[in-house]
Amino acid sequence: MGDHIARGEDFENKAEKKLGGWALFGSKYEDAADLFDKAGNCFKLAKSWDKAGAVYVKLANCHLKLDSKHEAANAYADAAHCYKKSNIKEAVSCLEQAVNFFLDIGRLNMSARYYKEIAELYEQEQNLDQAIRYAVYEINPGSEDVSAPPNQCLKKIAQFSAQNEKYPKAIEIFEEIARHSVNNNLLKYGVREHLLNAGICQLCKGDVVPINNALERYQELDPTFSGTRECKLLVDLAAAIDEEDVAKFTDAVKEYDSMTQLDAWRTTLLLRVKETLKAKELEEDDLT
């Protein structure tokens, strides 16, 4: 590991000397870029992530001197992937630089890819407002028109919103995805999942009347929904909430989970509902 660091520092020093010297046209930047790239690879082998990130930023600057925004963007992305392991703030900063350069050269797919990475980093840091912001950018990078965003991006925004206890926003998005999908042969099989997600968010609000009204709407939207395990789960959970019965709530979740494992997001939200239900049950016990 020490050898890799020593080699990396040697390449980096040689690159700095190239930049400080005189050369025709852009050759010194080309030579320095090659050396910085080698230095970055050495630092990565040594798992010296801060050094690797810093040297890739220097590499990006060389590419900018050579008027190559594409290569500069790639170098910033490489820097970010190193910083991800040691410095989230720097990782986000480098990804933002990469996005800006990809937008400049019209590489919208690459911009969207790195917006997604930024959103995931903010989610990791529990900064859900920022995660939502960058997930929105991912929908249609470089444009104000978000009229037909991909369902996966919208789903992520809805999930972040629910995690942040912004349930009405999450419900609105999940229901819109379901409406958009129900008449699409490729997407219609996912409708029950979106309606389940919307229903769980309804449960988090804790008011039984809107939950039951929502279930009626969902069955009108998709007539097949009433015969699904997802619908049965929501009906059983709504009944448990109405009866303030924690055991009934737990049994309904266990029954569903035994056949279709609940993911972490759904589990987190259902635990919130259960804790609220427990608190109500204890309150009732105290009163009696």
From Swiss-Prot:
Q: How does it sit in the membrane?
A: Peripheral membrane protein
The places in or outside the cell where this protein is found are: Membrane
Alphabetized, the UniProt keywords read:
ER-Golgi transport, Membrane, Protein transport, Transport
For this record, the Gene Ontology CC terms, alphabetical, are: SNARE complex
Superkingdom is: Eukaryota
GO BP field:
intracellular protein transport; SNARE complex disassembly
Task: Extract the GO molecular function terms from the UniProt entry.
Answer: soluble NSF attachment protein activity; syntaxin binding
S-adenosyl-L-methionine keyword on record: no
Record carries keyword Repeat: no
Which Pfam family, giving just one, matches this sequence? SNAP
Give the family from UniProt.
Belongs to the SNAP family.
Role played: Required for vesicular transport between the endoplasmic reticulum and the Golgi apparatus.
Question: Know the name of this protein?
Answer: Alpha-soluble NSF attachment protein
